[in-house]
A protein has these predicted regions:
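Hydrophobic transmembrane alpha-helices and their helix-loop junctions in integral membrane proteins
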Residues: 1-239
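Alpha-helical transmembrane spans of integral membrane proteins, capturing the lipid-embedded, hydrophobic core
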Residues: 41, 123, 251, 255, ...
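Membrane-embedded and interfacial regions of multi-pass energy-transducing membrane proteins
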Residues: 75, 226, 230-242, 256-275
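Hydrophobic alpha-helical membrane-embedded segments
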Residues: 126, 210-217, 258, 299-319
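Hydrophobic alpha-helical membrane-insertion segments
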Residues: 162-170, 246-265
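Membrane-helix interface motif
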Residues: 172-189, 259-278
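Loop-to-transmembrane boundary segments
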Residues: 240-251, 345-351
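Aromatic-capped, Gly/Pro-kinked transmembrane alpha-helices
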Residues: 263-301, 308-351
Length: 351
């Protein structure tokens, strides 16, 4: 239990998720490195290393999977309402970490393979989005999406790169995020039919997928379209050539893995999954097309539902601002911390 608590705090799982959006002060390349591939993945890496030892226990399954599911839903929902580009990406990271945690919590070898695959895919599309956000901040002077409108006419090439990366984050077909997300959907369907979980897990997974599409659409539409810029500190323009190279490389990986997953990530995924499972690999397929399956239907429903959520976002913003938007986990944490210090001072004075 103590190890699992360490994992949850390190990888920003609910209710310890609130620190991650406030840890964005580093320069853009550092943020991209820390928040897509290294620091926040340390907790789920520990889950992966402990998977062969602990995954058979019922406590692991229920605690890890339910925490991952709560984090997946909360992060996806909250990301839609963040006005700061990095804030949106931070909460989307929380959601994807919840997805990975949920897969490890399910406890089957195939779920672990899907988790490892999504760790790799998330690192590529999220790093490219953080780099794109840094370019936008550098050239426009702000990350506020209420001001960043209509940048397509000023930065069309950057917009195309960001749109591909956001599509991968949303799980659009022929991009890498679609493949690992479909594997995730497939596992939820399997559990609903074979393990007696019934309908609620696939429903929750599809709902999270809808919000992922919605916040990805907001990243694209609010920044590059949606009217004209509003009082930008600088006149935006395309960045210097070498500033775009890291984003280009990562976006090419998103495309290449989405189209040719077995050729590009196949050997690396097999090696990483074998190291995680500490044994033989289960049968799995990295094909782009598996036919008309329930997982594909969930993916298409998530895309359609996400577009619908984004189309009716204004009433949702109003409801959010009057309800859950008022809750601040960081404020609760600081109050608890202050209470601990006051209690320690009282005990010290008595002694």
């Amino acid at each position: 239990m103590l190890i699992i608590l360490c994992v949850f705090t390190k990888s920003a799982q609910f209710p310890f998720h609130f620190w991650l959006p406030h840890a964005m002060a580093a320069p853009t390349p550092v943020s991209a490195y820390l928040h897509s591939a290294t620091m926040v993945k340390a907790g789920v890496f520990l889950l992966a290393r402990l998977f062969p030892v602990l995954s058979d226990s019922a406590e692991w399954t229920w605690i890890v999977s339910l925490t991952g599911l709560a984090t997946l839903l909360l992060g996806a929902y909250t990301a839609l309402f963040k006005h700061d580009l990095k804030g949106l990406l931070a909460y989307s990271t929380i959601s994807h970490l919840g997805l990975i945690t949920l897969l490890f919590g399910i406890g089957t070898p195939l779920a672990a393979v899907a988790a490892v695959f999504h760790i790799m895919n998330h690192a590529t599309f999220k790093a490219s989005l953080f780099m794109a956000a840094g370019i936008i901040d550098h050239e426009a002077g702000t990350r506020d999406m209420r001001k960043l409108n209509g940048l397509w006419k000023y930065m069309p090439y950057t917009a195309v790169l960001a749109m591909v990366a956001a599509g991968a984050m949303a799980g659009v077909p022929l991009l890498n995020g679609f493949l690992s997300k479909e594997m995730f959907f497939e596992k939820t369907v399997y559990l609903s039919t074979e393990a007696g979980v019934t309908w609620w897990l696939p429903t929750a997974a599809t709902l999270a997928g809808m919000f992922a599409v919605a916040y990805s659409l907001r990243f694209i539409h609010d920044v590059f379209f949606n009217g004209e810029p509003v009082n930008l500190p600088r006149t935006p323009h395309e960045p210097p050539r070498w500033m775009k190279v890291p984003v280009e490389i990562l976006v090419v990986i998103c495309l290449a893995v989405g189209v040719l997953p077995a050729v590009t990530f196949g050997p690396l995924l097999a090696a990483a999954a074998r190291a995680t499972l500490q044994g033989d690999l289960p049968q799995y397929s990295l094909a782009v097309w598996h036919g008309f399956t329930p997982a594909l239907a969930m993916s298409l429903l998530a895309i359609a539902g996400g577009a619908l959520i984004y189309a009716f976002r204004k009433p949702l913003f109003s409801v959010h601002d009057r309800s859950i938007g008022r809750v601040d986990g960081r404020r609760f944490y600081l109050r608890i911390e202050a209470l601990i210090y006051r209690t320690a001072d009282i005990i010290d004075s008595i002694l």
